[in-house]
Amino acid sequence: MFDIGVNLTSSQFVKDRDDVVTRALAAGVSGMLLTGTNLHESQQAQKLAQRYACCWSTAGVHPHDSSQWQSETEDAIVALARQPDVVAIGECGLDFNRNFSTPQEQERAFQAQLRIAAELQMPVFMHCRDAHARFLALLEPWLDKLPGAVLHCFTGTREEMQECIDRGLYIGITGWVCDERRGLELRELLPFIPAEKLLIETDAPYLLPRDLTPKPASRRNEPAHLAHILARVAHWRGEDPQWLAATTDANVKTLFGIAF
């Protein structure tokens, strides 16, 4: 199993990061993609990817941090992306839910990162919340120039999902789908994701699966819980968990070009 979304740079992991990685490996996780959400976090993620043989990282600026994007940021992201442990540009995209950066700042940073990914021929690791139409409008001109793209932590509608799949995007599914309050619609969409376009992730330390038992006292999510998410996704799709694990692993290798 490969976890395509781990925020291992989070302060929630500062005291036991080695143990978190050890527990993940013991739980059957064979690889992890560490998410970079701004320049500093991307640099830290790359250092952690160097430290742990089972980890790779992304380099990019999250829409929340898009106000930080400047020409110096771009130069630093490009330099970082040339490191062998960095296998995708992102986390980038649009988030019009809370607009921590203005829509204009988000669009500027997103388009710049799409251009970088195209120039470096690297896949993009993307985020979209309450911005689907504009997200696709900005992404569309770049699709034939990119080697691949994943929309991580998908929580949209069936129509939005189909529009993403029709454009060749991979779909990242998190423990959100295990939430009996807000994940039911996503759960119903699982069978409509082509197996060859499905990826799984924890988004740890966030999105602890609500149906996990026993729940950790800290309420912190970990990559070790990926097995639980995969088992639930396989159940709701009517597939064998081992087959789905092998299939999603193959998807990771295809999209990110890594061996694990």
Curated annotation (Swiss-Prot):
SUPFAM superfamilies: Metallo-dependent hydrolases. It comes from the Bacteria. A divalent metal cation binds at E91, H127, H152. GO terms for cellular component: cytoplasm. Coiled coil: none annotated. It is an enzyme of class 3 (hydrolase). One of its GO terms (molecular function) is magnesium ion binding. Its cofactor is Mg(2+). Its EC number is 3.1.11.-, 3.1.13.-. The keyword Repeat does not apply. It is found in: Cytoplasm. Keywords: Cytoplasm, Exonuclease, Hydrolase, Magnesium, Metal-binding, Nuclease. NCBIfam families: PRK10425.1 (NF007745). 3'-5' exonuclease that prefers single-stranded DNA and RNA. May play a role in the H(2)O(2)-induced DNA damage repair. Monomer. PANTHER family: DEOXYRIBONUCLEASE TATDN1, TATD FAMILY DEOXYRIBONUCLEASE. Belongs to the metallo-dependent hydrolases superfamily. TatD-type hydrolase family. TatD subfamily. This is 3'-5' ssDNA/RNA exonuclease TatD. It comes from Citrobacter koseri (strain ATCC BAA-895 / CDC 4225-83 / SGSC4696). The gene is tatD.
